[in-house]
Amino acid sequence: MMLITTHSLLLLLLLLQLLQPLQFQEAYYEDFYFPAYRDKEDFEDFMVEFQSTGPTRPPTKEKVKRRILVNPGMPLGDSGYCNYQIMRKNVYYKYSCVTEHYFLLMQYDELQKTCYNRFVPCKNGIRKCNMSKKLVEGVYCNLTKASNIPLCQYNSFYRRGYVLITCTWQNEMQKLIPYTINDLVEPPEHTKSFLNEDGVFVVPP
């Protein structure tokens, strides 16, 4: 049985990053042409977190933009969307595949404003989340097969709904910033509903 060492795994990740522009340069727009890490600082930040044995580093604006937000290009309904984007953006937890993830087609400023919206229940019913006031397009990724990273396999589900997020205080910016994406809630079908101030769907009489 061949053992995959940390050194060989990192070399594999580097190779995949170099190959991606060649594989997708004719298929999609600019966001899908260049490797995810466009400068040395971004890549070094990824390597430190990847090799760390301690807790996950706190989120930053650039990290949220890099791992969660996407630009127009590859169709959001593509069945291979998550497999490609997870690998391209290096969305892993240490040496493991993440069990689920969300990609959102929106600007960072709009997502950050959501941190100041009213609290609503999260999908787990425990923590408090903030809900966007507008519908957001995105993709929900659900892990179906876990192997040695980066060869994680996902089902991709297109969604258009209200995004639920948790936020945290960022000392350097002196602002609340997005921390995790909890859910992308699709509005009820075949009803003319709207959100009240408490973030609850209401159907007019």
From Swiss-Prot:
Query: Which UniProt keyword terms apply here?
Result: Disulfide bond, Glycoprotein, Secreted, Signal
Report the GO molecular function annotations: nucleic acid binding
Disulfide bond sites = C97-C152, C115-C167, C122-C129
What are the annotated GO cellular component locations? extracellular region
Which subcellular locations apply to this protein? Secreted
Q: Which residues form the signal peptide?
A: 1-24
The residues that carry sugar chains are N130, N142
What domain of life? Eukaryota
GO biological process terms, semicolon-separated: defense response to Gram-positive bacterium
Q: What does this protein do?
A: Does not exhibit any ribonuclease activity.
What's this protein's family per the entry? Belongs to the pancreatic ribonuclease family.
Please report the name of this protein according to its UniProt entry: Inactive ribonuclease-like protein 9
Underlying gene: RNASE9
